[in-house]
């Protein structure tokens, strides 16, 4: 991830096609050692591509992934309750163990 961040930093600074050496310099400025193998794969995968198009394509792919959006919102609301919510959470682990066997209709080997 650090390699991608350094690459995107260079692109946002105006370098449309950063080299491995450019990325290494950015990482070295933050006292981070570059992983040569990962860096070479990153440079090879992004060579000749517009980063904005790659990001847009990735966003489209992520948008099509089901995320079960209601569950995190419910969890966030419970966390805002404070100490009372923590006490209730300690009382419920036994119920969660029973629910963990429920595959919600998605059998792994069906």
From Swiss-Prot:
Q: Please tell me, according to the UniProt entry, what happens when changing residue 100 to A.
A: No change in acylation capacity
Q: What result is annotated for mutating residue 12 to A? A: No change in acylation capacity
List modified residues, type O-(pantetheine 4'-phosphoryl)serine: 59
Positions carrying Phosphoserine: 100
> Could you name the domain of life of the organism this protein comes from?
Eukaryota
The UniProt PTM text for this protein says:
4'-phosphopantetheine is transferred from CoA to a specific serine by acpS. This modification is essential for activity because fatty acids are bound in thioester linkage to the sulfhydryl of the prosthetic group.
Q: Where is the composition biased (Low complexity)?
A: 63-84
Q: Where is the composition biased (Basic and acidic residues)?
A: 85-95
Cite the effect that the entry attributes to residue 67 to A. No change in acylation capacity
Q: Which Gene3D superfamilies match?
A: 1.10.10.1410
What residue intervals traverse the membrane?
A: none
Query: Impact of altering residue 64 to A?
Result: No change in acylation capacity
MF terms from GO for this chain are:
acyl carrier activity; structural constituent of ribosome
Q: Does the keyword Lipid biosynthesis apply?
A: yes
Where do the record's region annotations for Disordered lie? 62-110
One GO BP: cytoplasmic translational elongation
Quaternary structure, per UniProt, is: The phosphorylated form is part of the ribosomal stalk involved in the interaction of the elongation factors with the ribosome during protein synthesis. The phosphopantetheinylated form is part of the 10S triacylglycerol biosynthetic complex involved in de novo fatty acid biosynthesis.
> Protein name, please?
Large ribosomal subunit protein P2
Source organism of the structure: Rhodotorula glutinis
């Amino acid at each position: 991830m650090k390699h991608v961040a350094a690459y995107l930093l260079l692109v946002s600074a105006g370098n449309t096609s950063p080299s491995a050496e450019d990325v290494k310099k950015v990482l070295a400025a933050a006292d981070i050692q570059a992983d040569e193998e990962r860096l070479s794969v990153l440079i090879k995968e992004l060579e000749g591509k517009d980063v904005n198009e790659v990001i847009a394509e990735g966003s489209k792919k992520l948008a099509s992934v089901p995320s079960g959006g209601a569950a995190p919102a419910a969890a966030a609301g419970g966390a805002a309750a404070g100490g009372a919510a923590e006490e209730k959470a300690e009382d419920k682990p036994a119920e969660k163990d029973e629910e963990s066997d429920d595959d919600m209709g998605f059998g792994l080997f069906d």
